[in-house]
Each structure stands twice: as C-alpha cells, then as structure tokens.
Amino acid sequence: MERLNELCDIIEQNPKQFLDKLPWICQQCPQSKLLRAESPRFSQSHLNAILAVTRILSKIVDTTDENAKFVVLDFLQTVPKSFHRSFWPYSLSLESISAFYCSFLGYVSCLSQLMVEGYLLRAAQRSDIFAHTLIWHLQGESVEEIVKDGAFDKNASFQEILSDVRQHIVDGFTPKALNFFSREFDFFEKVTSISGALLPLPKEERVAGIRRELEKIKMQGEDLYLPTAPNKLVRVIQVDSGIPLQSAAKVPIMITFNVVDLDGDHNDVKPQACIFKVGDDCRQDVLALQVISLLGDIFQAVGLNLYLFPYGVLPTVVPNTRSRSQMGETTDGGLYEIFQQNYGLVGSTTFETARANFLISSAGYAVASLLLQPKDRHNGNLLFDDVGRLVHIDFGFILETSPGGNMRFENAHFKLSHEMTQLLDPSGVMKSKTWHQFVSLCVKGYLAARRYMDEIISTVQMMLESGLPCFSRGDPIGNLRKRFHPEMSEREAALFMINVCTDAYNKWTTAGYDLIQYLQQGVEK
C-alpha cells in the first residue's frame, strides 16, 4: 500500500477545491474494491480522488494503441514521478478518454497549476480524432449563451484558456491534418445548421426543407466520420431520410447516413441515424448520460439484465430507432397494437421477445429516471429500437428543473403511460407475471444503484459549478441523495421502489402532460 499512501499524501496537500472537484469514481475500475478493503485510513473522498482520472482512462477500446501511451505519459508529467511510476496504467487509448470529455474538462478546470493547457495540446497532437472531439467539447464549454449570472466566475481562468487551446490545437495541425479537420467540421456544421434553418418554417414545410438543404451538401472525401462514432465512415447522406422531431423551442432533426466500418469491409454499407439540434447546451445531456452509463455498468457488474443506452452526444446518435411520436403518425393504435404489427401476434416468439426487450429497458430507465428526474417526457423524447427496446433522449430538464417555469406537472418518478402498462401488465390490475417481473427488476436495479450511491452522487457533484440549468435552483445534490434513501434498510428501500412503480402506473399527470404536448406541439400521444 506504499504507493496508495503516497498518493493520498499528495492529495491531502492540495487545496480543498481539489477534493471538492474530484469526488467521482471509476465505475469499472478493478482497484476500487481492493482500495476500500485495504485502506481504512483513507476517506471516500480520497479514494474518489485517487480514481478520478482512472475513471476517464478506464474505458479501454484498444490497449495496443501506441498513441495512448504518450497521452498517459504526458498526463503523468503533471504529477510527481515517484507516484506515476508505480500507480498509473500506461496502455490506454485516446478513445477511452473521449467518452468522458465533459467531466474531464470539469476535472482539469481546477488544475491549472498542473499545466492543463500543455497536456491537452500534447494529447491533441497524438491523434486527429482526439483533437477533433476535444475541439467540439471546448466549443461547447465556451458558448457565450450559457454564461449566466456569473455562473463561471469560479472557473474564469479555465474559461480564458479555452479559445487559446482550440487555436493552438488548430495551429499545430500539419497541412494534411488541417485539411482533414476543415472538411470534417465543415461537413457536419452544414448538416447541423439545417436544424436552425428550419425554425422559421411552418411544420408542414420542414420535411421538404430538410431535403432541400441536404441536397446542397456534397461529400468532401471518403474519410469523413460520424463525430460520436469515429469508426463509422460516411459514404453518403440519405437525402430522403430527414425527419423533424418534436421540440418546443428548437427543431431537432434526424438524418440517416450510409456508413461503413473503418476497419471492416468497405463494401458493407449500413444505415446509421443521427439527431442534430442547433442552439442547445448539450453538456447537461452529457451529465445525464454519464450517470446512465454508470448505472448500466453497475447493473452489468451485479448481473442484472437491465437495458440502458448511453448514446453519444455531439450530434446525438441512437441507431435504428423511431420516436414514439413518429410511430403514432403511421398507425392509429397504441404500443400494444404497434408491437403486434411489427413483431407478430401476442404469444408468438417474436412478440414476446420484443415485449421482454421493452420490459428490461423500461425497468432500466425507471431506475435512471427516479434518480435523475428527467422531465418533458413526451412521446417525441421516447425512442424504440428495432427489437422493441425503449431509449430515453433529450435531458434538457433533469434534477430540479422542469418545463413551464418549473411547474413539475409530471410528478411521477418515471413515465409509465397507459399504453406502456398494456405491454407490461396485460391484466390491467398489476397482477400479471410480466408486471411482477418489471417491478422485481426495478427493485433490484434500485438496490444495486444504492450500493454505489456515493459514486453516482460524485459524478453529478463534479459538475456542480458548471452553470448548468439543472443546478440553478433548490438543492440538487441533497435531493439526489434523498432519493437513494440511505436511512432505509434494503427491505424498506425495496418497498419504496415498489410504491414508486405503483404510483407511476398510468398516472393522470403523465396522461395530462401527453395531452398538453399534443394540443400545443402536435406530439402524438
């Protein structure tokens, strides 16, 4: 434990802000249980701090990536050599960092004394993809619209370096890398800008408007990739695929690309749908999706068959999906009828498989929704993939915020509308086998999440000073902790989750919100 003692001493010598910023833990880090078992003298905050960067670096995609070794080595120059020689992993890929850029930037915002700018610049020089993704996130961090009421005063010095870092990255590109960067960004800026161009158009003209704009965009080489899936090379835009999605203030659009795998057969072309939206601060979605990713890893670690899909956010990518609202535009029935149309008669293998997929995904998002409290859960924000699984998107209202000036009209902890209960509970009175399976999975998922309460809270707490709307009112961290009910026994917590499921069952406020969205926005209910 000598190396652990040394690191904890290092952490203890840093300002309090260091520990306040860092308390979030690696959900997959194999050392975490060992550290807790063998180091009773160290607080949870110390252990969280020890594993903070490990969390970012632990999403191993390709441990043979030589560039990764340089990235880690460069980062290790910012901490005492006696520590990094013994503790840190040395073979982690750049891609393993990129899934957590937003929190990574939050982490480094309090470490200016550790040559943050130099580290980011050196890392960007090792990989074009790393540089591109970093630039996208730096742009998201420095948008003037999101600076309100001095929200960034505490991070003013960090904000000051953002534009400089971006420019220095671009200045450091070779001519070939600069050409690649310019083509990639120009292409997707044109695609994304369509969302803004549609805003003044009447709804009935938006489909034609998307096609008209897409026809103007020309491919600029065969090396362009989807920003959230760098292994997917874009071959062509399906100009007829554009669909305007439902949103009160924006016009998100879904566009399908024909793509090939970077390392696969380039003749094997497949469709990949992406959602683009102009004018939104996506960092709140990133925060919600990090918690969802953490929950997914927790469920997997304890052997729970619960489904969550923490999609990527730059533009948002959710493959092979349609929103519930879109499904309603092509059929008069509810989910029960739609599932029969798509998967066969009730009782058939295909239907029951789809129902099971819907069940495990609904249970996963029930637990996530209880903790994150996402609102604005109209049918435009619920996607279904081609095997029946539910995916929640658009986390513009989480924790303490809700639409309509924080009316909190949607007061169920998660959405469980009448048509959803028809699939989950054929009996209609909470007596069916599938209903009991659903509730059982919700309980097991909630109990599993409670065991990692500090880690989940730390993930959210790290962004507390970010200026995000979800932290703008009330006591978001305190109320998040209350929803875990740490004072309860496991039995009491299980009963609490059962009551949450019962309360959400076809709740009138859920139906009422869907009706309001249908009347105001035309969102199919």
Curated annotation (Swiss-Prot):
It catalyses: a 1,2-diacyl-sn-glycero-3-phospho-(1D-myo-inositol) + ATP = a 1,2-diacyl-sn-glycero-3-phospho-(1D-myo-inositol 4-phosphate) + ADP + H(+). Residues 373-381 are annotated as: Catalytic loop. It is found in: Membrane. Residues 245-251 are annotated as: G-loop. One of its GO terms (cellular component) is membrane. Residues 163-278 are annotated as: Pleckstrin homology (PH) domain conferring phosphoinositide binding specificity. One of its GO terms (biological process) is phosphatidylinositol phosphate biosynthetic process. One of its GO terms (molecular function) is 1-phosphatidylinositol 4-kinase activity. Coiled coil: none annotated. It comes from the Eukaryota. Residues 239-509 form the PI3K/PI4K catalytic domain. Signal peptide: none annotated. It holds the Pfam family PI3_PI4_kinase. Belongs to the PI3/PI4-kinase family. Type III PI4K subfamily. Acts on phosphatidylinositol (PtdIns) in the first committed step in the production of the second messenger inositol-1,4,5,-trisphosphate. This is Phosphatidylinositol 4-kinase alpha 2. It comes from Arabidopsis thaliana (Mouse-ear cress). The lineage of its organism: Eukaryota, Viridiplantae, Streptophyta, Embryophyta, Tracheophyta. The gene is PI4KA2.
